[in-house]
């Protein structure tokens, strides 16, 4: 009598194969979802950091320079033209001290001229377009010409707009003090935060310090409790985005600094 072959090969049923395939598919989908989520979070984090860092650096630079201002900040439009009221506005301009204090005397060789000097052996020479402030004579005027009196000199003859240097008359052996200021500005235009280093001598020259700015009118003068402009402060609202990762739907990552009220240093000048 022949016995049956008990060692014959066995296989999976169709139902078992389908269940195993489904399990593998579910695991693969879960792993893909986790990896994709991680990549999205990484991309978003990088985008946020880039946008935040650029806007933060821009605001810190604006705040630093406003802290150095010696004139009441003035609101301007994107073409650096003055605007009325408390804003908001695209830009702001103000004066900072760039050199001085200097002694001011009438030139001994030409009394009709004035001479500014310092005991500093290596002073920074004022430049045409800088603003000269002589508080004792209420003189605030732009420098139109400057000549050094000798090579390596630490004193110069200075000529002011409208002949204002002729208003300064000092007695022999006496002097008055002057400061040299420069009007600078920050303007948002075409999504760029632009820095203007000298609005008198080179009004069209600027450098871009932040990009992708989404707040076109970030500057204003805050109101005090009575509802009038508080000119002691400048309010800055700056926001930015980084569109690099827009394909992952994180284009609108941004930073917004609302009402960062920045006080200026002092009011040395009476005029803008």
Predicted regions and their residues:
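N-terminal pilin/flagellin-like segments and related low-complexity appendage regions
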Residues: 46, 55-211, 215, 271-272
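N-terminal leader/signal peptides at the extreme start of proteins
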Residues: 1-12
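Aliphatic-rich helix starts adjacent to a transmembrane/signal segment
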Residues: 10-67, 271
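Acidic surface patches and DE-rich sequence motifs
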Residues: 8, 74-76, 224
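Short linear sequence signals and composition-biased patches located at protein termini or domain-edge surfaces
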Residues: 50, 98, 180-183, 190-272
């Amino acid at each position: 009598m022949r016995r049956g072959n008990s060692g014959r090969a066995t296989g999976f049923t169709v139902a078992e194969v389908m269940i195993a395939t489904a399990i593998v598919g579910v695991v693969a989908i879960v792993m893909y979802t986790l990896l994709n989520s991680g990549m999205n979070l990484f991309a978003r984090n990088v985008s946020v950091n880039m946008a935040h860092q650029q806007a933060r650096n821009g605001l810190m630079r604006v705040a630093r320079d406003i802290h150095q201002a010696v004139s009441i900040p003035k609101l301007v439009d994107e073409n650096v033209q003055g605007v009325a009221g408390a804003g908001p506005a695209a830009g702001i301009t103000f004066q900072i001290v760039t050199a001085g204090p200097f002694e001011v005397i009438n030139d001994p060789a030409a009394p009709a001229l004035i001479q500014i000097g310092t005991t500093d052996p290596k002073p920074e020479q004022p430049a045409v377009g800088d603003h000269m402030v002589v508080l004792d004579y209420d003189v605030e005027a732009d420098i139109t010409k400057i000549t050094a009196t000798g090579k390596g000199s630490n004193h110069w003859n200075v000529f002011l707009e409208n002949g204002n240097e002729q208003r300064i008359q000092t007695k022999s052996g006496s002097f008055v003090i002057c400061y040299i200021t420069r009007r600078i500005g920050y303007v948002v235009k075409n999504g760029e935060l632009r820095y203007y280093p000298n609005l008198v001598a080179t009004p069209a020259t600027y450098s871009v310090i932040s990009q992708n700015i989404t707040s076109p009118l970030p500057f204003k003068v805050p109101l005090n409790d009575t509802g009038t402009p508080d000119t002691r402060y400048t309010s800055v609202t700056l926001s930015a985005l980084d569109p690099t990762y827009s394909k992952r739907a994180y284009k609108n990552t941004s930073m917004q600094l609302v009402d960062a009220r920045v006080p200026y240093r002092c009011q040395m000048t009476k005029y803008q």
